[in-house]
Swiss-Prot record:
PANTHER family: POLYNUCLEOTIDYL TRANSFERASE, RIBONUCLEASE H-LIKE SUPERFAMILY PROTEIN. CDD domains: YqgF. Could be a nuclease involved in processing of the 5'-end of pre-16S rRNA. Its main location: cytoplasm. NCBIfam families: RNAse_H_YqgF (TIGR00250). This is Putative pre-16S rRNA nuclease. It comes from Desulforamulus reducens (strain ATCC BAA-1160 / DSM 100696 / MI-1) (Desulfotomaculum reducens). It is found in: Cytoplasm. GO terms for cellular component: cytosol. The keyword Cell membrane does not apply. The keyword NADP does not apply. Keywords: Cytoplasm, Hydrolase, Nuclease, Ribosome biogenesis. One of its GO terms (biological process) is rRNA 5'-end processing. Pfam families: RuvX.
Length: 137
């Protein structure tokens, strides 16, 4: 079962995909946010192209586990996705995923300019890999 992981921000959406067996996550692309319609169309294209069967959305939470203002924006985004795309959607705690992605890119000696371009899809991959590693389905 192929799963699409999303790291939803105000300006970008990081997209990652699992392999068909659901073992590993790879960063796919960073969608520059435009209109909600264009965002949904691009997600639908990816879903069709890669035969995605489930969507996992990173849920930003405060360190105490509560949902803050960014989490509310993500919940609103999920509602828009549900209106346009008929797939199961789950959320996953994304706390510190961007920090983990940044550390991986630094360890791989990726330049600061390049990191800025790929950090969101790497964060999506970290979120998705955490979900896959947990065995949750």
């Amino acid at each position: 079962m192929r799963i699409m992981g999303l790291d939803v921000g105000d300006k970008t959406i990081g997209v990652a995909l699992s392999d068909p067996l659901g073992w590993t996550a790879q960063g796919l692309e960073v969608i520059r946010r435009d209109t909600i319609e264009k965002d949904m169309n691009r997600l639908a294209q990816i879903i069709s192209e890669y035969s995605v069967e489930r969507i996992l959305v990173g849920m930003p939470k405060n360190m105490n586990g509560t949902v803050g203002s960014q989490g509310e924006k993500v919940l609103a985004f999920i509602e828009k996705v549900k209106e346009k795309i008929d797939l199961p959607i789950k959320t996953w705690d994304e706390r510190l995923s961007t920090v983990a992605a940044e550390k991986m890119l630094i360890q791989a000696d990726v330049s600061r300019g390049k990191r800025k371009k790929v950090i969101d899809k790497m964060a999506a991959a970290v979120i998705l890999q955490g979900y896959l590693d947990s065995g949750a389905k």
